[in-house]
């Protein structure tokens, strides 16, 4: 699929989805005489390299020509200041009860007006890397934020002759217009002193004000793209997907869903000691066709944490840019990065597409299984869910803990158990639509598992245990038995992590965990005016599950 860039004059009128107060205000700013269009990645690199505050390291980019960069390209570092994570409190989504377009467009008009005092850069990229799903996106950002522009072009697919030709072959779907995003990290409106991330999902536009952190631009773009996918027969996925082929040629395609820090990147890129022929689609953003189960990656590169990668780690070979990390001099006087979150939390880097040796942009094999990654001390390391309703509702109650990738409001407990439906805090449409999409996949034969990547009771679950569980599932050697007396909820014994239903204390722990899920689902009936309320069958399934747990 593709989106629409141009319109016949007779179609430029009220009633066309490409023209609304928000979108027209945002798009108009792109055409000012203070706007310079940047379409060349090598130029974007030079601009980022030369902007004030950039640290040009002495670390060469690996095979830079493969990424469209100069042959002498170096890893660039740029730091943002105090804020080093996304701020959910800044998000305003048109269509939700709290969003008043009349008031918001006043803010947009002011922000657009003040761009006249700055030189602005306009660039474009494709979101989606196959003719099945491609969206054209446009970003407008001020001079001095060349690193953000450069990172955005690296994170998504810059327009090249190869991808331009692919895009031409994509079939336009409906009247979906191109994405337009206006960003001014230096502009703060009095109504939004902590910044504004505004989304008009039906008209494919957004405005980011007071947002320096690159993750806001990455996820802001994906927020709109996932909405387009949802409207056009795809399940939007914030997670990783890979294929593992056994020696007998049998392929197993698995998707893992979790927030930053859940292990989704680690599990997606795990090599399994060469036991399988592993092919990676992506570790963060893709879409699954509800028609045939195939998947398309939305991004070519990887925006990864640097916390687990000390300087000499081999994975750092694939770095292109680094954000919110330190710099020091090595024994040869060379400028090198300081990682492991020594400087601050949530250090980040963009890694090239080459990081995954076997990478594809479309997974032709249909997906076999979905794994919800949770951090819930009541759960054993793995659970298998056979009922499509229970499988989908448990994804809607995906339990985790907050991470350094987020900027939290004052007073929020970092260690509290929270629920993030389908590990996707970037949804702009009613939650019930994701519930139905995932349920449809499970009804079509896709298996569902929960992997607890945190603690079981008070014992950490090592990543090696989790990877071993995945391998036993792929190999067909995992022996699942009923979890207690819950026949359609199964587990497999993992030494040191076996739930004891004779222990009243343990039963109480899992009882409390399920009650919290019910409280969360019940709260959706009120939050956002009930916009994210789930179907009765889902709510009833949770209540029934709680009753069954009480009877154990």
Predicted regions and their residues:
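Charged, amphipathic alpha-helical linker segments immediately N-terminal to NTP-binding catalytic cores
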Residues: 175-232, 236
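Conserved, well-ordered active-site substructure
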Residues: 253-255, 271, 292-307, 460-478
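Glycine-rich phosphate-binding P-loop
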Residues: 244-275, 280
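Phosphate-binding P-loop
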Residues: 202, 233-251
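N-terminal accessory targeting/assembly segments
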Residues: 1-163
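Short, glycine-/Ser/Thr-/acidic-enriched flexible segments
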Residues: 128, 212-215, 247-249, 261-262, ...
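Conserved NTP phosphate-binding and transfer environment spanning the P-loop NTPase/kinase superfamily
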Residues: 2-73, 78-80, 325-552
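Conserved nucleotide-sensing/catalytic segment adjacent to the nucleotide-binding pocket
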Residues: 277-349
